[in-house]
C-alpha cells in the first residue's frame, strides 16, 4: 500500500528511511511549537490556543503536501511572518489580531487562485537554473546561520553585530550550550560520513541527552530571564477548550477604523514574503533531493504550491499566522526523505504534539543546531554547479547567496538575485537569457522596495 501510494522504489527510498527522516524534520521544526505561541501572545492571543492552532495548521499543510504532491516538505507557521504579524501589524500599525488573521486568510485565498491559474508555477519555472543553485546554496547558509544562533555559537555584539560566544563569562548558560552544539555537530558529521542511518536524528537526541546530563550535574543552569529553561520534558496535558478563543475569529474582525489601503498593504506584505519564501524553499530543498528535472523544473510544483495555499487559509481560520513550507524540511531530505511518506510522519507528529506539547517544546535550540548547521553544509554544495566562467550568471547567484543569511530572509535573497540577474544581463547585452516574466518580477521587486 505504501509503495503504491508514495512510489518508494521509484524514488530509491524505503519506508524505514522515510519514517526516520520524517521524525528528523519534525525534531528540527519542533521549536515553532514554543516560539509561535510566545510571539503571537504578544499580539493579545491566547498562547495555548495558538499552540493548538499551530499543530493543526502544520498537520493539515504537511498532509496536503504529502497527498497532493508526494513531496517530503513540511509546513508550519513561518518565522518572520509571525513576527511581522505580532510586532508590525498588531504592534506598530495597531490592528487587532483578528484583522491580521483576516489578512492572512485573504492572502491564502489569493494564493489558491494563483495556484489554480498556474501563476505561481510560472514564477517558479521562470527563475533561471543558475539562480536556483544560488538560492539552494543561500538557503544552506541561512539555515546554518539559524543553527549557529540557536546553538549560541554566535551571539549579538553591539560593535560588530555578531561575535563568537564568550565561554568563560557565560559558561553555565551560553557557554555550555555552544559546547554541546559543537559536540553534536561533530557527532552528526562523523555518523553521516560513516553512512549511519538516521545520523541527523541521532545527533539531535544525543545532544539533548548530553544537555540533560549537564543539567543534572549542575554544569547547565536554568536562567529563565535570559531564556535558558529546564531541559527536562514535562508531561502536562493541553487544555483543548482554549482553541475556541481563536478558531473562526478572523471572520469576526472589526474593520472600523481600518483604512482600505493600509489593509491592502498588509495583505500584499504577507503575500510577497510567503510566496517567495515558499518558492525559495521548494527550489533549495528539491534541488538538494535531486527532484528538479534537467530544465530546473519541479514536476509537481503546482500541487506543492496548492498545499501551501490551503495551509495558509486553514491556519488563519484556526488562529495562527501564515503557514508556509519550512526550510527545515532539508534536514529530513539530508536524512534520506524523498517522498510524501516522510511528510505523513511529520504531520502525524504535529498532531500528536497537541497532546504532548510540553515534551516537544522542551527540545532546546542547541540540540537542533547541529542538524541545521550540517544540513546547511550539504545545501551549500549546490554552488559548485554555477558556471563561474560566465559572470552574468555567477554574480547574481553570489548576491542571492550572501543576501539570504545577511538579510535573514529567503524572499529578499530571491529579490536581490532576480533584480541583479535582469540588470546585469540587460546591460551586458545578453537579453536573450531574460524571459518576459523575469522582467516583470524585477519590476515588481523594485516597486516593492519603493512602495512597501
Question: What spans do the regions from the language model cover?
Answer:
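Membrane-embedded alpha-helical modules
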Residues: 93-209, 213, 344-452
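Membrane-helix interface/capping residues of multi-pass secondary transporters
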Residues: 47-48, 73, 97, 410
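Helix-loop-helix hairpins and the membrane-proximal interhelical loops
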Residues: 1-49, 165-169, 204-302, 445-447
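Loop-to-helix transition at the N-terminal end of transmembrane alpha-helices
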Residues: 44-63
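Transmembrane helix-loop junctions in multipass membrane proteins, especially transporters and channels
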Residues: 41, 66, 70, 74, ...
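Residue-level signature of catalytic and energy-coupling elements of molecular machines
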Residues: 19, 39, 123, 198, ...
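Transmembrane alpha-helix interface/packing and boundary motifs in multi-pass membrane proteins
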Residues: 61-73, 189-195, 269-277, 308-318, ...
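Helix-loop-helix junctions within the multi-pass membrane cores of secondary transporters/permeases
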Residues: 2-36, 57, 78-87, 91-139, ...
Amino acid at each position: 500500500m505504501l509503495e503504491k501510494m508514495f512510489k518508494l522504489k521509484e524514488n530509491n527510498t524505503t519506508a524505514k528511511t522515510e519514517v526516520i527522516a520524517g521524525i528528523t524534520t519534525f525534531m528540527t521544526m519542533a521549536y515553532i511549537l514554543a516560539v509561535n505561541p510566545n510571539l503571537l501572545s504578544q499580539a493579545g492571543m491566547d498562547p495555548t490556543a495558538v499552540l493548538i492552532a499551530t499543530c493543526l495548521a502544520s498537520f493539515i499543510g504537511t498532509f496536503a503536501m504529502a497527498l497532493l504532491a508526494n513531496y517530503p516538505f513540511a509546513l508550519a507557521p513561518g518565522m518572520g511572518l509571525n513576527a511581522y504579524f505580532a510586532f508590525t501589524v498588531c504592534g506598530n500599525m495597531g490592528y487587532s489580531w483578528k484583522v491580521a488573521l483576516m489578512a492572512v486568510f485573504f492572502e491564502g485565498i489569493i494564493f489558491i487562485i494563483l495556484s489554480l491559474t498556474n501563476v505561481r508555477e510560472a514564477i517558479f519555472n521562470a527563475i533561471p537554473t543558475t539562480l536556483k543553485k544560488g538560492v539552494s546554496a543561500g538557503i544552506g547558509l541561512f539555515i546554518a546561520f539559524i543553527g549557529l544562533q540557536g546553538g549560541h555559537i554566535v551571539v549579538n555584539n553591539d560593535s560588530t553585530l555578531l561575535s563568537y560566544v564568550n565561554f568563560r563569562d557565560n559558561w553555565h548558560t551560553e557557554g555550555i550550550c555552544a559546547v554541546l552544539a559543537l559536540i553534536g555537530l561533530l557527532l552528526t558529521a562523523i555518523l553521516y560520513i560513516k553512512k549511519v542511518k538516521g545520523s541527523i536524528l541521532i545527533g539531535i537526541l544525543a545532544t539533548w541527552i548530553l544537555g540533560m546530563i549537564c543539567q543534572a550535574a549542575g554544569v547547565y543552569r536554568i536562567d529563565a530571564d535570559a531564556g535558558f529553561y529546564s531541559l527536562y520534558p514535562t508531561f502536562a496535558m493541553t487544555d483543548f477548550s482554549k482553541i475556541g478563543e481563536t478558531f473562526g475569529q478572523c471572520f469576526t474582525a472589526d474593520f472600523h477604523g481600518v483604512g482600505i489601503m493600509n489593509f491592502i498593504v498588509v495583505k500584499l506584505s504577507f503575500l510577497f514574503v510567503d510566496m517567495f519564501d515558499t518558492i525559495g524553499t521548494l527550489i533549495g530543498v528539491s534541488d538538494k533531493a535531486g527532484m528538479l528535472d534537467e530544465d530546473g523544473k519541479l514536476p509537481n510544483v503546482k500541487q506543492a504550491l496548492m498545499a501551501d495555499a490551503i495551509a495558509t487559509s486553514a491556519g488563519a481560520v484556526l488562529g495562527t499566522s501564515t503557514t508556509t513550507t519550512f526550510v527545515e524540511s532539508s534536514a529530513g531530505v539530508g536524512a534520506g526523505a524523498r517522498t510524501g511518506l516522510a511528510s505523513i510522519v511529520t504531520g502525524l507528529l504535529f498532531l500528536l504534539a497537541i497532546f504532548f506539547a510540553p515534551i516537544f517544546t522542551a527540545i532546546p535550540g542547541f540540540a537542533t543546531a547541529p542538524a541545521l548547521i550540517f544540513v546547511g553544509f550539504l545545501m551549500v554544495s549546490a554552488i559548485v554547479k554555477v558556471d563561474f566562467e560566465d559572470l552574468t550568471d555567477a554574480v547574481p547567484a553570489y548576491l542571492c547567496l550572501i543576501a539570504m543569511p545577511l538579510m535573514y530572509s529567503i524572499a529578499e535573497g530571491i529579490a536581490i538575485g532576480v533584480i541583479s540577474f535582469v540588470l546585469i544581463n540587460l546591460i551586458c547585452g545578453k537579453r536573450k537569457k531574460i524571459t518576459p516574466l523575469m522582467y516583470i518580477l524585477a519590476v515588481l521587486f523594485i516597486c516593492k522596495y519603493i512602495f512597501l
